[in-house]
C-alpha cells in the first residue's frame, strides 16, 4: 500500500513539474508546490532583468575595462553573499513547508535590490541626462 501511495505521489509531482508554467495560475496558487513554483518564476524573471542591466552596464562602460572588471568582481561577491544569506534564511525556516518560499523570496528581493544598485551606480548620469535603461522596480 505504501509503495502504491508513493508511486501515485511521485507521478503527481512529476506531472506537475513537467506541466509547464501555464499549468499554475500564480494569482491563485493554492499549495506549497504551486506557491514555490510561482516564487521560482518570479526569481527567474528578476535574474533575467539583472542580467540585462549588468550587460548594459558592461556595454555602457566598455571603454573603462578596469570598471567593467570591478563590476564583474563585485557581482561574483554579491552572488556568494546572496546565496549564503538566503541559505541561512532557508535554515531559519527549515522545519516548515514555508522554507522554500522564504529562501526564494530572499533571493528575489536581493536580486531586485542588486539590479537597482547596478542601475543607480553604472547606468545613470549626475545631470539630467536620461538613464541608459529605465529605473528597475524594487519589491513591493
Which residue stretches match the model-derived regions?
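N-terminal signal peptide c-region/cleavage motif recognized by signal peptidases
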Residues: 12-16
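Positively charged n-region of N-terminal signal peptides that target proteins for export
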Residues: 1-4
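N-terminal alpha-helical modules
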Residues: 18-140
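A periodicity- and composition-biased signal for non-globular, repetitive helical segments
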Residues: 8-9, 120
Amino acid at each position: 500500500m505504501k509503495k502504491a501511495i508513493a508511486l501515485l505521489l511521485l507521478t503527481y509531482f512529476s506531472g506537475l513539474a513537467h506541466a509547464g508554467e501555464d499549468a499554475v495560475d500564480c494569482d491563485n496558487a493554492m499549495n506549497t508546490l504551486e506557491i514555490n513554483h510561482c516564487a521560482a518564476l518570479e526569481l527567474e524573471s528578476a535574474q533575467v532583468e539583472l542580467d540585462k542591466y549588468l550587460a548594459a552596464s558592461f556595454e555602457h562602460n566598455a571603454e573603462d575595462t578596469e570598471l567593467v572588471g570591478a563590476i564583474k568582481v563585485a557581482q561574483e561577491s554579491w552572488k556568494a553573499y546572496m546565496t549564503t544569506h538566503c541559505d541561512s534564511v532557508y535554515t531559519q525556516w527549515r522545519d516548515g513547508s514555508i522554507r522554500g518560499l522564504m529562501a526564494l523570496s530572499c533571493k528575489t528581493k536581493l536580486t531586485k535590490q542588486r539590479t537597482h544598485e547596478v542601475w543607480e551606480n553604472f547606468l545613470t548620469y549626475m545631470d539630467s541626462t536620461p538613464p541608459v535603461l529605465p529605473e528597475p522596480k524594487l519589491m513591493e
